[in-house]
């Protein structure tokens, strides 16, 4: 029996899937002349792409690390924090690009919603790891 979409719980690794989607969306937008003109691409476009790729690769890296080793758990937490930090940098870059290039509001809204959703998923994953670590320690 299948579960209705509205009743589904988020998958454990929606964070990874959404990060890849956000990275793709960011790369596509950063290369569009109407969003980041060539004159601004070296300053804004490249940084947007680099930040999106950093976020996605750090999430992938964190996912390969296990919680049953103290060293790996610590490294995983660091990768998660760095990925979360990248989402905040990405949000700043998106707002800056909008202020400079005045691309469409609907694109800005959708893009920032994707980033906010990724931040929520990342925080949820980090909280889940924290709860699992505490449960294993008890």
What are these model-predicted stretches?
Residues 1-138:
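Amphipathic alpha-helical assembly/interaction segments
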């Amino acid at each position: 029996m299948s579960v209705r979409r509205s009743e589904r719980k988020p998958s454990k690794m929606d964070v990874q899937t959404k990060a890849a989607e956000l990275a793709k969306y960011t790369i596509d937008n950063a290369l569009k002349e109407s969003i980041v003109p060539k004159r601004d691409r070296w300053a804004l476009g490249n940084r947007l792409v680099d930040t999106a790729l950093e976020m996605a690769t750090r999430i992938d890296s964190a996912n390969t690390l296990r919680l049953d080793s103290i060293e790996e758990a610590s490294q995983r937490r660091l990768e998660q924090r760095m990925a979360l930090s990248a989402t905040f940098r990405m949000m700043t870059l998106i707002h800056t690009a909008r202020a400079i290039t005045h691309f469409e509001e609907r694109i800005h809204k959708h893009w920032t919603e994707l980033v906010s959703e990724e931040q929520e998923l990342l925080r949820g994953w980090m909280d889940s790891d924290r709860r699992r670590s505490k449960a294993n320690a008890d």
